[in-house]
C-alpha cells in the first residue's frame, strides 16, 4: 500500500484520505471536479466531495473495506496530478 508520505497534501482522518483544494474561482473548481469525475469513473472509484465557490473538499474511502485502500491512494495521486493542471 502507498505511504501517506507520498501524498503530503492529504490527511488521514475518520478512516478516509481528505484534502481541501482552492481555485481562482468557481469555474476552475467546477472544471477540476469534472476532470476528476472522469478519472473516478475510469477507476470505478468515486470520491465523496463538496464544492463551495472556489473550494473543493474531497474525502476518499473504500466502503467495502471500511477504510482506506490502495484504490484511495491511487485516486488521490491522480487527483493531485489533475490539480496541478488547474493550479497554474
Task: For the regions a language model picked out, list residue spans one by one.
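Charge-rich alpha-helical segments
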Residues: 1-88
Amino acid at each position: 500500500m502507498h505511504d501517506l508520505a507520498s501524498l503530503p497534501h492529504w490527511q488521514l482522518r475518520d478512516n478516509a484520505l481528505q484534502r481541501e483544494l482552492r481555485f481562482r474561482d468557481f469555474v476552475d473548481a467546477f472544471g477540476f471536479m469534472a476532470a476528476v469525475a472522469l478519472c473516478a469513473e475510469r477507476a470505478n472509484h468515486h470520491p465523496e466531495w463538496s464544492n463551495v465557490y472556489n473550494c473543493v473538499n474531497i474525502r476518499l474511502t473504500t466502503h467495502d473495506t471500511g477504510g482506506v485502500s490502495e484504490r484511495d491512494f491511487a485516486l488521490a495521486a491522480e487527483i493531485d496530478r489533475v490539480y496541478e493542471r488547474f493550479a497554474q
